[in-house]
Amino acid sequence: MKINSIIIGAPSSSSGKTTISIGIMRALSRRLRVQPFKVGPDYIDPGYHNIATGRFSSNLDTWMSSREKMKEIFIKRSTGSDISIIEGVMGLYDGKQPDKDTGSTAEVARTLKSPVIIVIDISAMARTAAAIILGLIKMDKRLRISGVILNNAGSDYHCSIVRTAIEKYTGIPVIGCVKRSDDLKIDDRYLGLKTAMEDDNSGKIDKIADIIERSVDLDLLIKISKESGDISFKSGLFSKKNVNRVRIAIAYDAAFNFYYYDNIEMLKMYGAEIVYFSPLNDYKLPEADGLYIGGGFPELFAERLSDNYSIKKDIMEFFNSGRPVFAECGGYMYLSRGIKINGKYYEMASIINGESYMDSLILGYRNIRAESNNILMMGGWHVKGHEFHYSRLNVNANAYKTERGPDGISTKNLLAGYMHLYFPSNPRIPERFVRSCYNV
């Protein structure tokens, strides 16, 4: 199958990939059906993709799943779109290992046979940009680097001299030059960009798209996307049929929005109806057979979460009824007795007998093994995932074993921990969660 696609890569992080990507996505969405993707385990950038295109963004990660599963996700999500835009991660060749590009943007580009557009920040360089692009080309000649977008240019003249150098020494066309502008800035914080749900970002994305339309040859970009190669897959990840009809309530608001889209889609595949609720704004849980509270920034909304006694009471009653409750990272914090922040203490849902507090960053891919049977996994099952947080929770962890040690809490109807599990790495997990919800 041939899918028109573009991968947007860069020599390094902080080159402007996300800003340029969401601008291209929104600009193209004004005339085409655009399917967005994000390379790697990130949960924040896909939120901007969703707003930019009106379609949910999926993660493409060869370490957390496999090349075959990734191709299946890519083909399934791209069906019905005119073009797929894939935002890369870090530098083009940066992955999990120093001597291999596993999990990198380059590996994804090769696997999907997608042309690559390089975004390069030229704010502090001119002719040297050509040397950088030349190095990226020579590092792996199996890649199809088909265009360059210059970012953070100081003037039209700056654009002109860098364009001339790159096209002379590499033969690769410069398809756009974006000059520095305050309208291109997206606020960030310690875990990366602010989440797309924290502010009204649609207007901001429109301004970025307006700049992209003036600065990038989108017709040429569309033409390049049609150079994508044929791909097929042998996975069968989404070939399962409905198992049981259940309803799962998922927390989704400004405090909790770190989810892998394909996790939710796999729950649906096994028979779950998904209903959403807000621990910030709602006073009652919807009727449901299971509860899923994902990651996010509960520490930024601690006072509001603490003050919403009604929803906390409802969650406690739900848990005490014996129905399954699954929580990841920020959701894990929310289910604790409380969160300590800057000397203040905020009461949370009090399902877990422990308190959370802020500390140094913990970040990385994780191989995860269940220590015993729980609502999602049998003891000994493995799953891959990602850990990304600044908090700690003072409990005797007993749910998972990882390279860093134990994590999480597991009881008869509760599974909660810092790990963000990636269901496509073990499709038995969403099936078991649905069965757990059905069998209460």
UniProtKB/Swiss-Prot annotation:
Keywords: ATP-binding, Cobalamin biosynthesis, Glutamine amidotransferase, Ligase, Magnesium, Nucleotide-binding
GO process annotations (BP): cobalamin biosynthetic process
Enzyme class, UniProt record, top EC level: ligase
Domain of life: Archaea
Swiss-Prot/TrEMBL site (Increases nucleophilicity of active site Cys) positions: H420
SUPFAM superfamilies documented for this protein: Class I glutamine amidotransferase-like, P-loop containing nucleoside triphosphate hydrolases
InterPro entries: CbiA/CobB_synth (IPR004484), Class_I_gatase-like (IPR029062), CobQ/CobB/MinD/ParA_Nub-bd_dom (IPR002586), GATase_3 (IPR011698), P-loop_NTPase (IPR027417)
Cofactor field: Mg(2+)
Catalytic reaction(s) noted: cob(II)yrinate + 2 L-glutamine + 2 ATP + 2 H2O = cob(II)yrinate a,c diamide + 2 L-glutamate + 2 ADP + 2 phosphate + 2 H(+)
Active site per database record: C329
EC number: 6.3.5.11
UniProt keyword Nucleotide-binding present: yes
Pfam families assigned to the protein according to its UniProt record, in alphabetical order: CbiA, GATase_3
Gene Ontology molecular function terms on file: ATP binding; cobyrinic acid a,c-diamide synthase activity
UniProt pathway annotation: Cofactor biosynthesis; adenosylcobalamin biosynthesis; cob(II)yrinate a,c-diamide from sirohydrochlorin (anaerobic route): step 10/10
Record family assignment: Belongs to the CobB/CbiA family.
Something else known: The a and c carboxylates of cobyrinate are activated for nucleophilic attack via formation of a phosphorylated intermediate by ATP. CbiA catalyzes first the amidation of the c-carboxylate, and then that of the a-carboxylate.
UniProt domain comment: Comprises of two domains. The C-terminal domain contains the binding site for glutamine and catalyzes the hydrolysis of this substrate to glutamate and ammonia. The N-terminal domain is anticipated to bind ATP and cobyrinate and catalyzes the ultimate synthesis of the diamide product. The ammonia produced via the glutaminase domain is probably translocated to the adjacent domain via a molecular tunnel, where it reacts with an activated intermediate.
Protein purpose: Catalyzes the ATP-dependent amidation of the two carboxylate groups at positions a and c of cobyrinate, using either L-glutamine or ammonia as the nitrogen source.
Protein name per the record: Cobyrinate a,c-diamide synthase
Organism: Picrophilus torridus (strain ATCC 700027 / DSM 9790 / JCM 10055 / NBRC 100828 / KAW 2/3)
